[in-house]
A protein has these predicted regions:
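Secondary-structure junction motif
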Residues: 129-149, 213-221, 228-237
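Central regulatory/effector-binding core of bacterial HTH transcription factors
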Residues: 29-93, 152, 159
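Short, well-ordered beta-strand segments
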Residues: 33-37, 85, 108, 132, ...
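Flexible hinge/capping segments at coil-to-helix
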Residues: 27, 94-105, 109-131
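Hydrophobic hinge/microswitch elements
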Residues: 69-74, 78-82, 88, 137-193
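Basic, amphipathic "hinge/linker" alpha-helix immediately C-terminal to the N-terminal HTH DNA-binding motif
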Residues: 1-15
């Protein structure tokens, strides 16, 4: 019985928050609460910079981060627990979805691995190596890539923790495939290799009800798009 009324209660709370944000905007007060669904790589490498910029312009807006895996974020968006969320494309989630970045998938292998000296890691070799995987509900990127290549991984270990995978590879327990964003800026004792054939994921931002989003939510969504565009245009200009 309680589960049946929960969506209605969440809907009323969301409408109340949107009304409060709109009233605050009319008064010239940029306040309210924005609930952000996110996964690890974005939470670690993107959101701190995005939040810093957003709070410098809208210091009265409260931001609540909800960290999980792809499945968690889509569930939060569906049931109204999050106002907006980062998703991997393509997504079944309804609403306004904006593609932000194509993020390469890379092989993570022990430094003394027999294939570590190659210029690229052949995806088919995953069949011959102990493979360390995220849980099935979390590992859409690697599983999609392997299925597309017709490769059946020799899954030896599974975990929900991205960084636990890196630590296990470091100890020589197996190999894995992970997004470049997640691996950036780390100094682990592992070898990061491009895949052959190459593979990637696309990170997007979803507003499940963009037409009814409160002003603070809409402004944060715009901040996200601007931040990603400026950050990666600077990187391209630096490397070109």
């Amino acid at each position: 019985e309680g589960e049946r009324v929960l969506p209605a209660i969440r809907g009323m709370l969301n409408s109340k928050e949107q009304l409060e944000q709109t009233a605050a905007a009319i008064r010239g007060l940029d306040c309210g609460t924005v609930r952000i669904g996110t996964f690890t790589s974005v939470a670690v490498h993107w959101l701190p910079g995005m939040i810093k910029r957003f709070q410098s312009e809208y210091p009265k807006v409260e931001l609540k981060l909800m960290n999980g895996d792809y499945h968690d974020v889509e569930q939060w968006l569906s049931d109204g627990s999050s106002d907006l969320g980062f998703v991997a494309l393509p997504t079944k989630q309804r609403g306004r979805v904006t593609a932000l970045l194509e993020d390469r998938l890379l092989a993570v292998v022990p430094v003394d691995h027999r294939l570590a000296s190659l210029p690229r890691f052949p995806i088919k070799e995953v069949e011959n190596e102990p493979f360390i995987s995220l849980l099935e509900t979390s590992d859409h990127d690697a599983r999609r890539t392997l299925e597309a290549a017709g490769v059946k991984p020799n899954i030896r270990y599974t975990t929900k923790d991205d960084y636990a995978i890196i630590a296990m590879v470091e100890q020589g327990l197996g190999v894995s495939i992970m997004p470049e964003l997640l691996l950036s800026g780390r100094s682990d004792n592992v070898r990061i290799m491009e895949l052959t054939p190459p593979a990637s994921r696309t990170i997007g931002l979803c507003l499940p009800d963009a037409d009814r989003a409160g002003p603070a939510t809409a402004r944060f969504a715009q901040c996200v798009s601007d931040w990603v565009r400026e950050r990666y245009s600077r990187i391209q200009n630096t490397t070109s």
